[in-house]
């Protein structure tokens, strides 16, 4: 199975401009993401998908591969779709979408979503990762997306709010979403062509579009947490984690 991992990266960010190039222990964040991904088994190719020449130069500077996408891409999925069209992938090729703000992603987490497609061919169109929240401050933080899933590990909903809500107890597991997706090229093209979903627009979560239009998302539960970098403070958290790893 051909497996291409794409890391969408854009320079402009309202909360943290230039985030992909923010230094973490002397290396740009995008390099940490790329190097972590390259340790995962089963990948055919890795590319950074960007529309910014500064990011392109940084990636090529450490020996990485880049595909330049349109600056008109309205979303991360549109950027991924643009990239796979340029790369000429086949309909059944597997695409891994690793968010560019995951500098501490564990390579085995990437292998987990690949394994789902290998073990359950044709049973679902999309797969992603979850992790049981340990840090209680994340429970009500809208930057940490929560998720619920059924007994067969198919996603029921994703939300920036705490889900599920325990009416009579607070002693229950809550899972957060980790920014890794897997899907076939054919599904990415179909997904990108769908109109914006109502719930997607409310929560600002693209994966809800898949659920709103009846597509199944398989969930793997990771044993490893990851830090999503949204602010400069998150950079310091990454450096602290790396210091003890």
UniProtKB/Swiss-Prot annotation:
Q: What is its EC number?
A: 2.7.7.90
Q: Please give the biological process terms from Gene Ontology that the record holds.
A: lipopolysaccharide biosynthetic process
Read off the Pfam families from this record: CTP_transf_3 (PF02348)
Keyword annotations for this protein? Cytoplasm, Lipopolysaccharide biosynthesis, Nucleotidyltransferase, Transferase
Question: What GO cellular-component annotations does this UniProt entry give?
Answer: cytosol
User: Which InterPro entries would you find in this protein's record?
Assistant: Cytidylyl_trans, KdsB, Nucleotide-diphossugar_trans
- One GO molecular function term? 3-deoxy-manno-octulosonate cytidylyltransferase activity
Record's keyword annotation contains Cytoplasm:
yes
Query: Which SUPFAM superfamilies does the entry link to?
Result: Nucleotide-diphospho-sugar transferases (SSF53448)
| Enzyme class, broadest EC rank | transferase
The biological pathway it contributes to is: Bacterial outer membrane biogenesis; lipopolysaccharide biosynthesis
Q: In which compartments does the protein localize?
A: Cytoplasm
Chemical reaction(s) catalysed:
8-amino-3,8-dideoxy-alpha-D-manno-octulosonate + CTP = CMP-8-amino-3,8-dideoxy-alpha-D-manno-oct-2-ulosonate + diphosphate
Q: Which domain of life is it from?
A: Bacteria
Family of the protein in this entry: Belongs to the KdsB family.
Protein's job: Activates KDO8N (a required 8-carbon sugar) for incorporation into bacterial lipopolysaccharide in the Shewanella genus.
Q: Under which name does UniProt file this protein?
A: 8-amino-3,8-dideoxy-manno-octulosonate cytidylyltransferase
Q: Look up and give the organism this protein is from.
A: Shewanella baltica (strain OS185)
Recorded name of the encoding gene: kdsB
